Amino acid sequence: MSRYLLAIDQGTTSSRAIVFDDKGAQVAVAQQEFHQYFPKDGWVEHDAMEIWDSTLAVCRAALNNGKIKASDLAGIGITNQRETTVIWDRATGQPIHHAIVWQDRRTASWCTKLRQDGHESLVVDRTGLLIDPYFSATKIAWILDNVDGARQRAEAGELAFGTIDTWLLWNLTGGKHHRTDATNASRTALFNIHTQQWDPQLLKLFRVPAALLPEVFDSAAEYGLTEPECLGASVMIAGIAGDQHAALIGQACFEPGMAKSTYGTGCFLMLNTGQQALRSENRLLTTVAYRLNGKPCYAIEGSIFVAGAAMQWLRDGLRLISHARESAEHAATVGVNNPVYLVPAFTGLGAPHWDPNARGAILGLTRDTGIAEIVTAGLQSVCYQTKDLVRAIRNDGARLESLRVDGGMAVNDWVMQFLSDILNVPVDRPSVTETTALGAAYLAGLQTGVFDSLEQITSLWECEHQFRPDMAPGLRESLYAGWLDAVERVCNH
């Protein structure tokens, strides 16, 4: 029996493919960037055909790099940028418009009107999401209303909608299968996370014809066989999950109270709440963590707009550092008791503040303040914002006992220690940092028998380093109080 798994990791700026073995070890990788389109202010688009072409290219390259044949694969897992919306012609397979990306804000005014008309409570109750351009529903309606004849063709069943996973599945299987998984469906604002069905009332609210929608499967399932000409053999696509959900799986956060936080340009914190779909009273999102054997596991999620991007700004905008690794050296000279606060609200503040009008600020400056203090404040801002999320999660009644971290900033020991100190929980950094792709491989492996159980996957997770809290409670409280004061000033500017 073959023990290799191919993970497709289709992201916002690049498509990647990674081959893993049956121990979760990386065997080969390939990556290719693709174009971003910004036709108007606040609009972000992708060419869906370019996404497909780049994905196929990296799959072939990864197999070639690892000297592995497609016939050596037990299965394929797909993980993807969430919410991004593609609509295509079922007969020709051609998109009728560029894909509208999750970052796109073109439907903001309609979302505002829907909220003002009192519809948000329905959306929160059924989907766990807020009414926001971020999610797929209003993007779908925009395409139907702005491409000639699209709405009529959609109602006649001639068109198909999909998030990126569905689009890739359609192409990999030669147009035979129009399917998605429960995690991606849960990000559309059209899927009832309690009934695990597309919701007729939400379809009516957002004016989306049911004929457009894919069939919803478990996250580990037989989605369909690839066409032989794609990779050289027919391979079962056996797992699908949105990127943050796949990272939760890759981090083996399978028990309620387990959480992972991914530190890239921004930050996504997701906490497993088990069989309970916990409704947030603090404007966090409730989502499907994954669905296995027909049983959904739920999570609560908070997002920070600026994490690693704060260090990019200090490097490229202010030129205070020439490389991100210098930041830890500066922080070591300043220490944790830094009176300077950097609130990186460059595009407003995300969860739990949700203030689009907030703008960035550096507070606490004195004549003694130098580059080191400002750089350290940038690092600390990531940890303070994470504490904002954790506090909101706890206020919603969820437990958070430890935090597993991944992403670019997770390699910074100083930041991870300060994160543990300010949260007052252990912070665990895994040996394998490619957690998103690994999660997709795990799902495919569960379905194809490479992995027997979640317990086996849990046994494969290894901690490279655990950071434990080592800060006096009084200092922790005073530092965080200073942060809250800084945020209040920014929000009330």
UniProtKB/Swiss-Prot annotation:
Superkingdom per UniProt: Bacteria
Gene Ontology MF term list: ATP binding; glycerol kinase activity
Record-listed ADP binding positions: 12, 16, 265, 308, 408, 412
Known EC number: 2.7.1.30
Sites where the protein binds glycerol: 82-83, 134, 243-244
Catalysis performed (reactions): glycerol + ATP = sn-glycerol 3-phosphate + ADP + H(+)
GO BP: glycerol catabolic process; glycerol metabolic process; glycerol-3-phosphate metabolic process
InterPro entries on file: ATPase_NBD, Carb_kinase_FGGY, Carb_kinase_FGGY_CS, FGGY_C, FGGY_N, Glycerol_kin
Residues binding sn-glycerol 3-phosphate, per UniProt: 12, 82-83, 134, 243
Pfam families the record matches: FGGY_C, FGGY_N
Biological pathway: Polyol metabolism; glycerol degradation via glycerol kinase pathway; sn-glycerol 3-phosphate from glycerol: step 1/1
The family this protein is said to belong to: Belongs to the FGGY kinase family.
Descriptive protein name: Glycerol kinase
Organism: Marinobacter nauticus (strain ATCC 700491 / DSM 11845 / VT8) (Marinobacter aquaeolei)
Gene coding for it: glpK
